[in-house]
């Protein structure tokens, strides 16, 4: 059976960057013939505002059952100030489909893209594995006496042994499979007693991987060290909130959010791929958005469905574009969104 890809272009610049990713997928089909069936879904702000529906529960179940992968552009629109549709679509997929692995690679394709003096492509090639279904994002808590001087808000952080163990084990397994020799865990165990669970499980699981060095950092120290000595890190594993923050920091070190792809996975099930950047409504329709994060997310999708050669071809085409200074203004280029997508697609076709 042919692999099935569901596409949610979303809001703002989402449709523009997804358009270019699908253009590159057409080039992949012409050369590598993976035979991927693409289904475009309407969900986003426009759909929500016209129907009152974010994404039907039955649709979520269908995606989990029938799709091999989901590609999302970006979700978020100022016309929906409560962000209900983004919460239901993005967090809904992560939680309801149990996509507990958030994989965010940060790889420098050209020395000129990093703001760090003296650092090169040899110093910046790391992956952040973020626990994607627990932590502070589970919305346990609430508010009391809202709008009064006595207002109270509470947010509980949820950490289960199962959740902590499976993301840590995934990080070590990935490191071994990809020839990485060090896994670093970030927490705040010196100030948050619950993070002792992360430390215990990290040591227990790490002991099963004697070929891999393990170390731990407090998250504030890691933020400093990631900027000062990024070459110290190969694989980072951490919780939901810290992973969200540290992966954004890592992305700016390799060229910005326009170069930052991501995958949301549960091995053996459907996976969701998306550029890390947001919907950037002020940029929508101006042909200025960098499509490379979406295209690199496509490459991660291809790798995830077993099309390793096609994934490598896409990644090489993006690298060639950066080397040739073909890009949007955020990476030092002069081209628009469409032209960048055209160039990368033609590079893939050329082989």
Write out the residue ranges for each language-model feature.
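Glycine-rich phosphate/diphosphate-binding loop of Rossmann-like nucleotide-binding domains
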Residues: 6-23, 27-31, 148-220, 229-232
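Buried hydrophobic positions in well-ordered alpha/beta secondary-structure cores of metabolic enzymes
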Residues: 11-14, 68, 129, 171, ...
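Buried hydrophobic packing segments
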Residues: 21, 25, 294-302, 344
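Glycine-rich phosphate/pyrophosphate-binding loop and the adjoining helix
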Residues: 66, 139-185, 189-191, 209, ...
């Amino acid at each position: 059976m042919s692999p099935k890809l569901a596409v949610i272009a979303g809001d703002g610049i989402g449709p523009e960057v997804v358009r270019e990713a699908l253009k590159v997928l057409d080039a992949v089909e012409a050369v590598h013939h993976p035979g991927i069936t693409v289904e475009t879904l309407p969900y986003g702000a426009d759909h929500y505002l016209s129907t009152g529906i974010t994404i039907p529960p039955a649709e979520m179940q269908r995606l989990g059952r029938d799709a091999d992968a989901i590609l999302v552009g970006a979700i978020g629109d100022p016309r929906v100030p409560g962000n209900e549709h983004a919460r239901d679509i993005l967090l809904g997929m992560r939680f309801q489909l149990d996509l507990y692995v958030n994989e965010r690679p940060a790889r420098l394709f050209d020395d000129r893209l990093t703001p760090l003096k003296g650092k090169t492509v040899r110093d910046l090639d790391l992956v952040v594995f973020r626990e994607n279904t627990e932590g502070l994002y589970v919305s346990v808590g609430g508010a009391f006496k809202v709008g009064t001087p006595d207002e109270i808000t509470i947010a509980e952080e949820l950490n289960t042994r199962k959740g902590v163990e499976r993301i840590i084990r995934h990080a070590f397994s990935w490191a071994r499979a990809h020839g990485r020799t060090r896994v670093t865990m970030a927490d705040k165990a010196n100030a948050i007693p619950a993070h002792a669970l992360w430390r215990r499980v990290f040591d227990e699981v790490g002991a099963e991987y004697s070929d891999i060095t393990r170390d731990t950092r407090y998250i504030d120290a890691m933020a400093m060290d990631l900027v000062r000595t990024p070459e110290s890190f190969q694989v980072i594993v951490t919780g939901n909130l810290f992973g969200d923050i540290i992966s954004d920091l890592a992305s700016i070190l390799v060229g910005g959010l326009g170069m930052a792809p991501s995958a949301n996975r549960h091995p053996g099930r459907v996976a969701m791929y998306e550029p890390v950047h947001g919907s950037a409504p002020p940029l929508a329709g101006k042909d200025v958005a960098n499509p490379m994060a979406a295209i690199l997310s496509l490459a991660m999708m291809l790798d995830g469905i077993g099309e390793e050669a096609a994934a490598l071809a896409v990644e090489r085409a993006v690298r060639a574009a950066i080397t040739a200074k073909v890009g949007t203004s955020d990476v030092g280029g002069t081209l628009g969104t469409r032209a960048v997508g055209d160039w990368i697609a033609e590079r893939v076709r050329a082989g």
